[in-house]
Regions:
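Iron-sulfur cluster-binding cysteine motifs and their immediate structural context
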Residues: 21-36, 50-66
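Short, ordered beta-strand-loop transition motifs
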Residues: 2-3, 33-35, 212-214
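Residue-level detector of conserved, well-ordered beta-strand and adjacent loop positions
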Residues: 12, 32, 40
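Extended, small-residue-rich solenoid/repeat segments and analogous flexible loops
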Residues: 2-4, 8-11, 15-18
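Acidic, serine/proline-rich low-complexity intrinsically disordered regions
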Residues: 76-327
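Residues immediately within or flanking Cys/His clusters that coordinate Zn2+
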Residues: 13-23, 42-52
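Short cysteine/histidine-rich metal-coordination sites, predominantly Zn2+-binding motifs
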Residues: 35, 40-44, 64-75, 92-98
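A broadly conserved detector of short glycine/acidic/proline-rich loop/turn motifs that flank catalytic sites
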Residues: 15, 66, 226
């Protein structure tokens, strides 16, 4: 039995207007135009549904092949965390949730390096998912480990070092098609300025609620409202007074801004989300994200505890807001 996930593509020829958008938008060049779109390379399909999502007539259906649902999980497994670290992570999660009143679990993120085993007790999803979708699942309490053949976003997967970059993404062409950027020059600059890990340097992504840790983490991701992000920012600088230089763009939110930048730079970073992350998940429009490198977590948690002694309750009680008076 194969570990691969494959998809079948069905086109409603009666509805199709042969506009060619599916061929232009497909990041992995599944289609050619020959009297309408022809999915000549269905084996290249990632199940991202960019083609069906941009079809003006909803004429395209992308479905996972039944054999993929029965695929065996034969990846090597090992325990990737010790008991002391488990208790530390649980305490971190409890402090953040209790003090900041987070609705969602803080998420532990571990990138599985090439040659490393997968963590014990973590499921591989049967279908492909976007990395940002896996983060949304983890904030709700689900643990997932995803090798490249379970990722459905070629952009995030290549950024995180699981694959190489498809040509349409490497050139920035697809961002022009989406009307996200004005010119090819702007698209090329955006692509060239974002960081990327070495292709094929990573085996998988692993995400889980921090209070149910499955591995040591590279980054902790927190989703919350702007006020909660403010306290995390203040907690990080509680002992230093340092002001933060955040890098946010509206592009590649979870993969670059929440994961890769904090992991690489050893600094916290905020993200407002991105088109793909918001369009493919249930993240609400009042939420934003922060990535915290694990190296900073002890000071962040200590800072949160200190802030909870006075300024957090004072701010939430609105102590400087004049009382409403009626004449």
């Amino acid at each position: 039995m194969s570990n691969e996930v494959s998809y079948s593509i069905t086109i409603n020829r009666d509805a199709c207007i042969k506009c060619g958008l599916c061929e232009r938008f497909c990041p992995t060049e599944v289609y050619i135009m020959d009297d309408g779109p022809q999915p000549v390379h269905p084996e290249w399909c990632w199940g991202c549904e960019t083609c069906s999502g941009n079809c003006p007539k909803n004429a395209i259906t992308v479905e996972i092949n039944p054999d993929a649902l029965a695929a065996e999980d034969d990846y090597p497994r090992a325990k990737l965390i010790d008991e002391e670290t488990i208790e530390t992570y649980k305490e971190w999660a409890k402090t953040l949730r209790d003090v900041l009143q987070l609705r969602w679990h803080p998420v532990g993120v571990r990138l599985i390096r090439k040659g490393e085993p997968f963590p014990e007790g973590v499921q591989i999803p049967k279908e492909r998912m976007r990395y940002c979708q896996s983060m949304m699942a983890a904030r709700r309490g689900v643990s997932l480990v995803m090798p490249a053949n379970r990722h459905s976003c070629p952009d995030g997967t290549s950024i995180l070092g699981l694959t190489d970059v498809p040509p349409k993404l490497a050139s920035g062409e697809i961002y022009i098609l989406f009307h996200k950027l004005d010119t090819q020059e702007a698209a090329s600059r955006m692509v060239n300025e974002r960081p990327m890990l070495e292709p094929y340097s990573m085996e998988a992504t692993c995400v889980f609620p921090l209070d149910d840790p499955k591995a040591t983490v590279d980054v902790v991701s927190v989703m919350g409202n702007p006020e909660q992000m403010m306290w995390l920012s203040m907690a990080t600088s509680y002992y230093t007074g340092h002001r933060h230089d955040f890098h946010a763009s509206g592009y590649n939110s979870h993969c670059v801004e929440v994961t890769l930048l904090p992991m690489r730079d050893k600094k916290i970073n905020i993200s407002f989300g991105c088109y793909g992350g918001r369009a493919s998940s249930d993240v609400s429009d009042d939420m934003m994200m922060m990535g915290i490198p694990v190296e900073l977590m002890p000071d962040v948690v200590r800072g949160v505890r200190e802030l909870s002694k006075r300024v957090i309750p004072q701010e939430r009680d609105k102590i400087y807001l004049p009382p409403m008076r009626s004449n």
